[in-house]
Regions:
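A generic alpha-to-beta junction signature in SAM-dependent methyltransferases
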Residues: 18, 66, 127-129
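S-adenosylmethionine
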Residues: 79-82, 86-157
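Conserved SAM-binding motif I beta-strand of class I
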Residues: 44-49
Length: 209
């Protein structure tokens, strides 16, 4: 599948809150979150993915939704290298969407949601404008929700990040007593599903209190 129903409410949030904003959608896959931002009136959306074939789907999706497509906004690249380039050029965004795979390894770096999600967040924080948003998504099925929350709470302790909202997976993705055959391997609470979606606000050091 290339379209994830469990992020339906996040797409709704993006459409309602990111109008006029610049957005970086990392690990974009087929770009549904970025297209939702465009549908909500975001002024600029850059979609990053390691694989061109997925970004081609993202471009087609944007066109089907009546949006102008600039190929330069769909960037086939390694996450680690591209974020370094953005930092060096001082390129900033009003919102960064961080939706990494559970595990991935390239020559430039390793993604392991169970062990280094904090590293991923700290990687993108410097390219987010003051007053902007960081949207984090973790699909680590075997990670408890309170363990994930502990990681975020630790990052928020200095006052530069703040948890604004946890976004639920819609009820129609949760199943019911007649369809659930096996319980989740780890308790996702305070989230309602193993897909753990969080909206954080960002303060720059010059303005944080």
């Amino acid at each position: 599948s290339s379209f994830y129903l469990d992020t339906k409410l996040l797409r709704k949030w993006a459409k309602e809150n990111l109008g006029g904003k610049s957005v970086l959608n990392t690990f974009a896959y087929t770009g549904s979150l970025g297209v939702a931002c465009l549908a909500g009136g975001s002024k600029k959306v850059i979609q990053l993915d390691l694989h061109r074939k997925f970004l081609n789907v993202a471009m087609r999706s944007a066109k089907l939704n009546g949006k102008e497509v600039k190929e330069s906004d769909y960037q086939t690249c390694d996450f680690w290298s591209r974020i370094n380039q953005y930092k060096k050029s001082k390129k900033m965004f009003d919102c960064v969407i961080l939706d990494p795979p559970v595990y991935s390894k390239t020559r430039k770096g390793t993604i392991d949601l169970a062990n280094n999600y904090e590293k991923l967040i700290n990687k993108v924080r410097p390219i987010i404008n003051d007053g902007g948003y960081l949207i984090t998504i973790s699909n680590a099925l075997f990670q408890r929700g309170d363990d994930h929350t502990s990681v975020l709470d630790k990052l928020c302790a200095d006052g530069y990040l703040k948890i604004e909202q946890r976004i639920d997976v819609p009820d129609d993705c949760l199943g019911n007593a007649a369809t659930i055959k096996q319980f989740l391997p780890a308790d996702p609470s305070p989230y309602n599903h193993s897909t753990k979606i969080t909206v954080l606000s960002v303060k720059r050091k010059s303005t944080a209190v």
